[in-house]
Amino acid sequence: MNGMRVLISPLSWGFGHAGRMIPLAMELERRGCEVVFAADAPLTEMIVRELPGIKTVEIPGLRIRYSRYLPQYVSIFLQLPVIVASAVREHATLRRLAKELDPMVIISDNRFGFCHKKIFSVYVTHQVRIAFPAFLAFLEPLAAWMHRMIISRYDLCLVPDY
């Protein structure tokens, strides 16, 4: 693994995704890899605080808005167009970063568009099956199919807390 460049990009829906990538980055560095994080400004600040000297690249993040009044599944459903547009932007950003950084591996923590056909791409998720409230359970097969389509674009899917 000596000298292998690994590009890690956590989802920007809070600090949890970045937080679980930090131990992975530490282990990769311990094994001789060069780790580069691609994240939005708040996550980049946290990553640099936790891993001084780590290389980071600032990229746009997706800010999901949580409603005080609507159930969260409704709030997120209403933001689906923004989520899809964000995945398209992520993919374009990654194509540019791939040329600039030439990583051998890409690790995406729930970033739907952060994979590359020519670079070994890993998708990290804690939720393979997306659960819905009981009265919307009929939508679960559709959500599962959509998530499988996303995951199938990657070379490997890791479920760290399984």
Q: Where do the language-model regions lie?
A:
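Conserved nucleotide-sugar donor-binding subdomain of glycosyltransferases
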Residues: Q72-G113
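Gly/Ala-rich phosphate-binding loop of Rossmann-like dinucleotide-binding domains
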Residues: A25, E29
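Structural motif
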Residues: R5, M104-V105, L156
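A short, glycine/small-residue-rich beta-strand->loop->alpha-helix junction that serves as a flexible
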Residues: P10-I22
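Short, polar loop motifs at secondary-structure junctions
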Residues: A39-E45, I106-G113, Y162
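Short loop/helix-cap segments at secondary-structure boundaries that form the rim of catalytic
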Residues: E45-L51, F112-I119, I151
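Active-site-proximal region of nucleotide-activated glycan assembly enzymes
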Residues: K117-Y162
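Conserved nucleotide-sugar phosphate-binding/catalytic loop shared by glycosyltransferases and other
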Residues: N2-R5, S12, R30-L80
